[in-house]
A protein has these predicted regions:
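Acidic, serine/threonine-rich low-complexity disordered tracts
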Residues: 1-92, 127-216
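Hydrophobic, well-structured mid-protein blocks that either form specific transmembrane helices
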Residues: 81-125
Length: 216
């Protein structure tokens, strides 16, 4: 297993290629959701200094993913980007084939993988170049079906060092899927640790780039 409870990945955050703050992915522990053991993973991103005055970002996303198959059991979001605010809490009941929010239930026939549970899942499997992987997710608005593909390798320079990385890109029907808030591209180190060295996340008003600076 390339990660474990207590793993902290800290990043320098760039917004539209300008350094603006920091972000962290942290595996906080194992908890039970609907009677299932799940890794609780927290993602936080926040701006600092002048960037925080011009366009403050204070985002927190928590997921609870299955400890064996790494699909999502629960997802919460607290998004604060400038004047844009959004919160959601989705619980997946796979025995009843529904995803529940505070206001509605949506029928599902898949094991959901949001951006972050998908990303941890990718760390646990061998990834072959040009192989297409298909996933589905629901984050409170609509069901999204998406594909991922390793398109090659790139050398990435980060504050932690230089890494040879596999590049994982989303697409749909041959087109780039990197157009909706929450879509991401990932550069995973081509070694046993499979570290997410670089993450690019599409946000409402631009693109946030995360570059790995510390692992603990």
């Amino acid at each position: 297993m390339p990660f474990k409870v207590g793993e902290s990945l800290k990043y320098i955050a760039e917004f539209n290629f300008i350094p603006v703050g920091q972000a962290e992915l942290y595996v906080t522990g194992i908890e039970q959701i609907n009677g299932n053991d799940a890794y609780h993973v927290s993602f936080s991103a926040n701006t600092k200094g002048l960037a925080n005055q011009l366009f403050p970002i204070q985002d927190r996303i928590d997921i609870w993913m299955d400890t064996k198959e790494f699909f999502t059991h629960r997802l919460t979001k607290d998004i604060n980007e400038g004047n844009c605010k959004n919160s959601v809490d989705v619980i997946f009941d796979y025995d009843k084939f529904v995803a529940k929010t505070e206001t509605k239930e949506v029928a599902i026939d898949f094991k959901a993988r949001d951006s972050f549970s998908m990303f941890y899942y990718l760390r646990t499997i061998p990834i072959k170049e040009n192989e297409v992987m298909s996933f589905s997710s629901y984050e409170g608005r609509k069901i999204v079906h998406y594909n991922l593909q390793m398109t090659g390798k790139e050398t990435v320079n980060s504050p932690l060092g230089t890494f040879s990385c596999k590049v994982i890109r989303p697409f749909s029907d041959g087109k780039n899927l990197f157009k909706n808030a929450g879509d991401m591209q990932i550069w995973i180190s081509d070694d046993n640790e499979r570290l997410p060295v670089k993450i690019q996340i599409k946000m409402k008003f631009g693109s946030m780039m995360l570059l790995l600076k510390k692992v603990s």
